[in-house]
Amino acid sequence: ETRYAFEKAGAKVDAVHINILLANKKLLEDYQILALPGGFTYGDDISAGKILANQIKYNLEEDITTFIHEKKLILGICNGFQTLTKAGLLPAIDKQHQEATLTFNDSNKFEDRWVYLKICSNKSVFIKEENVPTIYLPIAHGEGKFVTKDETTLNKIMSNQQVVFKYINECGEEAGYPWNPGGSIQNIAGICDPTGQILGIMPHPERHVEPTQHPRWTRNGLKEFGDGFLIFRNAVDYVKSNL
């Protein structure tokens, strides 16, 4: 689905296994976007995304740093978001340490439903200049509660405009469960790094790129694209214009 979304936006996509990348780190030089899709890497053993995060942190840290310095993009969806936080790539205020995590849902169960999101900041390259107040995406996770290590980190994320998405209800108001399915602090659903080049999001934009993927499309009528498509379109447009 992630591959399809990027291809629909005009990108040429290769699916590269982490072991291949670890064996040939120079592969990163051939690409402009690194996407970590949703799923259950390593069976979510230890904690969701932690093993992949360690592989990235201890084997690819310099390569990822170069990737970002070259103005390239990284997207983490669900398990990919969990991986980016545990690798210290998000929120990346103090680049030497992990500052946030995605932990077990307050409900202590797997949550699978559609949620409303509001776009809080256009700091992220993936959201630049979008004038869309609300988007509707599916979620599917057991460890989707976003928390920071302390209040200072949270305040910095907020003041830096790194909070890109928040959970809201159908009236556009921030609300608790079930609209905020994991119990994330401040209803945070997605954040970016200080450069805006790295985006992590718990809901699944790749599962709503076609209008017919909306659960009420027969009643609401068809739009040109599904709500999640803007993330992939903006990323590809950025690459075409800047890299």
Label every model-predicted segment.
Residues 114-116, 197-198:
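Structural motif
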Residues 41-43, 82, 123-126, 143-147, ...:
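Short, acidic Gly/Pro/Ser/Thr-rich loop/turn segments
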Residues 13-15, 74, 137, 190, ...:
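Conserved beta-strand scaffold positions in the cores of enzyme catalytic domains, especially
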Residues 134, 188-217:
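A glycine-centered loop/beta-turn motif at secondary-structure junctions
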Residues 118-195:
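Catalytic beta-strand/loop cores that center a nucleophilic Ser/Cys/Thr
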Residues 1-97, 103-111, 118, 149-158, ...:
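N-terminal beta1-alpha1 cap of cysteine-dependent amidohydrolase-like domains
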Residues 77, 140, 203:
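Single, functionally critical "micro-switch" positions that shape active/binding sites
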